[in-house]
Amino acid sequence: MADNLVIVESPAKAKTIEKYLGKRYKVIASMGHVRDLPRSQMGVDTEDNYEPKYITIRGKGPVVKDLKKHAKKAKKIFLASDPDREGEAIAWHLSKILELEDSKENRVVFNEITKDAVKDSFKHPRGIEMDLVDAQQARRILDRLVGYNISPVLWKKVKKGLSAGRVQSVALRLVIDRENEIRNFKPEEYWSIEGEFRYKKSKFTAKFLHYKNKPYKLNNKDDVQRITEALNGDQFEITNVNRKEKTRYPAHPFTTSTLQQEAARKLNFKARKTMMLAQQLYEGIDLKRQGTVGLITYMRTDSTRISTSAKSEAQQYINDKYGEQYVSQRKSSGKQGDQDAHEAIRPTSTMRTPDDMKAFLTRDQHRLYKLIWERFVASQMAPAILDTVALDVTQNDIKFRANGQTIKFKGFMTLYVEAKDDKENDKENKLPQLDKGDKVTATKIEPAQHFTQPPPRYTEARLVKTLEELKIGRPSTYAPTIDTIQKRNYVKLESKRFIPTELGEIVYEQVKEYFPEIIDVEFTVNMETLLDKIAEGDMNWRKVIGDFYNSFKQDVERAESEMEKIEIKDEPAGEDCEVCGSPMVIKMGRYGKFMACSNFPDCRNTKAIVKTIGVTCPKCNEGDVVERKSKKNRIFYGCSRYPECDFISWDKPVGRDCPKCHHYLVNKKKGKSSQVVCSNCDYEEEVQK
């Protein structure tokens, strides 16, 4: 008979932990938060020292009833929610609902869901840390005060359904500021000169560097001509050889932010998908005979620290697999996070290799686990040693430079290289063995015109990185923030980069005009610092909120009285309604744009926006092939005559038949390339870069 009750957030976590604890423990799930501020009202009493009015979340009544039923039967109750501020707040809300004593040591935390870690945590229960709870409460109340005051103003003055929040408004600002930089950018001309040189049977390239021992800018064609006219023949001399040994160290194990960035670059995962998969790996995977095991440590962390035991196990694995020379000699275990003394995201055991785990994981789970495992193991490997050489190739005071690099010892690069490095610094560039005074022959001198480029738009990975660098938000907020600005139609993704929409820019301009603090980066960073101080017990949460709200409410009053009403006109669709004959307009819905009758609400006719690709349906030969989106936002191709014709393809038909079997050909993406292949047989054409 179980006389100990353990409460966790999710059924998956409950199932894993119950197997470890045995028959004397009953483990049940709260299904996340059980209490929150009400949706129908502010829920914060600004006249009573910002007292929050928590209620049971709608739909959670049966869960709470079940929790209370089990709590009555239990001799002892343990609250085992996640080891962060959010988890601490969930534990506190549970203790209030179950009427547990505040002084009770009933809180258990573990950074990984393995048998040893879970059992050990139950030997050291503690009380609920109210400083962590207060930091989470303060964040929640601040966000509620901002959202519930600004949003109604935007509904009244701009459009219903809009919102503005502390972190999402700054994220939107970053996207818009970058777009304005691009709009205002004026390209500037510049030139380069590249020379191809021969030494014996070897060829190498070098770039123009100096004229008369000084940097010389090539701003236009005249500058280039001045250099090329000063050259006399094709003989050059090696005037300097600089050989160095360069050490490259591996990256630290993942934090939440770096995991989201690397998964976006290497696996093409969105931040939300990365966190969903990481949660599954953390909460437990059924390994059949080995039972259910959490494969990675807690995935919401800003720490790169690792435990001594994890470090030792990884080094033992490296020694056995690669040899002693591949084991790192560095003593540092990484930085401790700003929020808590968590560990980095790592495998719970290095010995559970990606190959061994493949049979138990879905394809995407395995890809993410492999990324986490390789990054962690590589972080404990020896640095790579590179031999670099710089050659100065000179004639008539005109200097070209060639840079070469070869890998002397691969070290960690045997296993893993960061995505951002793949394109640039890791390629070997061998130069011939040359010494000062050697003569080389120029076979080509090629000037090239260039123009400066504007800064690139944000990818999801770069936006996450920038939010982290600016210290805006927390590990748990990056993915929801990016989700929110997309769902509100404030930004859109084009070629995997964020572009602000007209609506996003209108909302931003209003918030900037009337609520300047909300979109101010420095203000948002300072607020995060104050939340950290609350968590550390150095600040009172009510004072922090009071100081903010006293000035904020004046901004709200000014906006209500001074903000002018903005009319956002619907974009004409270019066709008439087939029901009533009124013009159709383009609207934005939950799943993207659609056509609706301008005579709404008298006429409620709507139509999907169909994008044809200029190819006749290969199945019925009557309809057109159109681009559609699945519920998961994945593009697929179907027939415009659906449901009469049920043609469907994930790959884009090209409008030609296979010369071998006469089935239709499709354009299949392969990384950054694409290839025309047959949908039925093995026919394929050359890869298109």
Curated annotation (Swiss-Prot):
Site feature Interaction with DNA, where: 33, 139-140, 143, 148, 155, 300, 488
Enzymatic reactions: ATP-independent breakage of single-stranded DNA, followed by passage and rejoining
Domain Toprim, chain residue ranges per copy: 3-113
Cofactor(s) recorded in Swiss-Prot or TrEMBL: Mg(2+)
Keywords recorded for this protein, A-Z: DNA-binding, Isomerase, Magnesium, Metal-binding, Repeat, Topoisomerase, Zinc, Zinc-finger
InterPro entries, per database record: Topo_IA (IPR000380), Topo_IA_2 (IPR003601), Topo_IA_AS (IPR023406), Topo_IA_cen (IPR013497), Topo_IA_cen_sub1 (IPR013824), Topo_IA_cen_sub2 (IPR013825), Topo_IA_cen_sub3 (IPR013826), Topo_IA_core_domain (IPR023405)
SMART domains in UniProt: TOP1Ac, TOP1Bc, TOPRIM
Its biological purpose: Releases the supercoiling and torsional tension of DNA, which is introduced during the DNA replication and transcription, by transiently cleaving and rejoining one strand of the DNA duplex. Introduces a single-strand break via transesterification at a target site in duplex DNA. The scissile phosphodiester is attacked by the catalytic tyrosine of the enzyme, resulting in the formation of a DNA-(5'-phosphotyrosyl)-enzyme intermediate and the expulsion of a 3'-OH DNA strand. The free DNA strand then undergoes passage around the unbroken strand, thus removing DNA supercoils.
Name of this protein: DNA topoisomerase 1
Species of the source: Staphylococcus epidermidis (strain ATCC 35984 / DSM 28319 / BCRC 17069 / CCUG 31568 / BM 3577 / RP62A)
